[in-house]
Swiss-Prot record:
GO biological process terms held by the UniProt record: antigen processing and presentation; antigen processing and presentation, exogenous lipid antigen via MHC class Ib; innate immune response; NK T cell differentiation; positive regulation of interleukin-2 production; positive regulation of interleukin-4 production; positive regulation of macrophage activation; positive regulation of NK T cell activation
Glycan-bearing residues: N25, N38, N60, N128, N183
Protein name listed in UniProt: Antigen-presenting glycoprotein CD1d1
Sequence ranges on the Cytoplasmic membrane side: 327-336
Lineage: Eukaryota, Metazoa, Chordata, Craniata, Vertebrata
Organism expressing this protein natively: Mus musculus (Mouse)
Gene assigned in the entry: Cd1d1
Motif (Internalization signal): 332-335
Main location: membrane
Record's bilayer topology term: Single-pass type I membrane protein
Length: 336
């Protein structure tokens, strides 16, 4: 019992000393896109994401996986990385060959062109807990997953997949390799990435917001647009408000990536002409420290009025100066 206080202190320091990156969930996702136009032409491209950051890419035209971050190798040694990369190189060649054989076997039920997408990786939770996944889509429809120790079709998958799944599950070597990659290699690799990429993963970039409007498809209406850009991480809350009331007609578009790995989002609201008064766009983001951005539509109109006022004042001043000079010249001519 005398060691218990020291054990508790050690545990506390371990938790307290964890970085922010280790105290939130992160999804490590490998995305594979494979196209088969016919029996002699195919290509496979892959990208890898950790949270909102791309860490790797693998073009069909390249024999090796490219790093998109200085820390993309994580804590793996060069030898460990080469071994892992070789495993995927063998997989890519085998995958292409196996799909071509599968199409030959299933013809005429299934024929070219064929599109296959694969999403695999692991979800990392605080405390070193993790959960792996592997999903396969055929012609854009989710059809197969690897669950536990075996391949399974999902509800609604075509019945012709039963035979390939049976063959895959009979290959115990392949199933064991998939389990190892998902349950052991993935969490270990991601922990290294979280440590090596800590500064990038924990960065906070404040959003910039501005307002505009575009014509609406409805007569007598206009569409107000709230633009939000330059923020990281990706989660953000954008809403059109009238006072404290959220405007349920707010439509948020898709997140779009900027070249600097920040994000752009726009929120639109369709309103009747003349009903814009009192509306505001509110933006919440972790980088703002609770100080939300609030842009009032009425305030947007103020600069226009101010510019008109300044122009009118300048015209009056210029007119007065011209009149004064003209009077001076007239008076001078009268003296002469």
């Amino acid at each position: 019992m005398r060691y218990l206080p020291w054990l508790l202190l050690w545990a506390f320091l371990q938790v307290w000393g964890q970085s922010e990156a280790q105290q939130k969930n992160y999804t490590f996702r490998c995305l594979q896109m494979s196209s088969f136009a016919n029996r002699s032409w195919s290509r496979t491209d892959s990208v890898v994401w950790l949270g909102d950051l791309q860490t790797h890419r693998w073009s069909n035209d390249s024999a090796t996986i490219s790093f998109t971050k200085p820390w993309s190798q994580g804590k793996l040694s060069n030898q460990q990385w080469e071994k892992l990369q070789h495993m995927f190189q063998v997989y890519r060649v085998s995958f292409t060959r196996d799909i071509q054989e599968l199409v030959k076997m299933m013809s005429p039920k299934e024929d070219y062109p064929i599109e296959i997408q694969l999403s695999a990786g692991c979800e990392m939770y605080p405390g070193n807990a993790s959960e792996s996944f592997l999903h396969v889509a055929f012609q854009g429809k989710y059809v197969v997953r690897f669950w536990g120790t075996s391949w399974q079709t999902v509800p609604g998958a075509p019945s012709w997949l039963d035979l390939p799944i049976k063959v895959l599950n009979a290959d115990q070597g392949t199933s064991a390799t998939v389990q190892m990659l998902l349950n052991d290699t993935c969490p270990l690799f991601v922990r290294g990435l979280l440590e090596a990429g800590k500064s990038d993963l924990e960065k906070q970039e404040k959003p910039v917001a501005w307002l505009s409007s575009v014509p609406s498809s409805a007569d007598g209406h206009r569409q107000l647009v709230c633009h939000v850009s330059g923020f990281y991480p990706k989660p953000v809350w954008v809403m059109w408000m009238r006072g404290d009331q959220e405007q349920q007609g707010t439509h948020r578009g898709d997140f779009l990536p900027n070249a600097d790995e920040t994000w752009y989002l726009q929120a639109t609201l369709d309103v009747e002409a003349g009903e814009e008064a009192g509306l505001a766009c509110r933006v919440k983001h972790s980088s703002l420290g609770g100080q939300d951005i609030i842009l009032y539509w009425d305030a947007r109109q103020a600069p226009v009025g101010l510019i008109v006022f300044i122009v009118l004042i300048m015209l009056v001043v210029v007119g007065a100066v011209v009149y004064y000079i003209w009077r001076r010249r007239s008076a001078y001519q009268d003296i002469r």
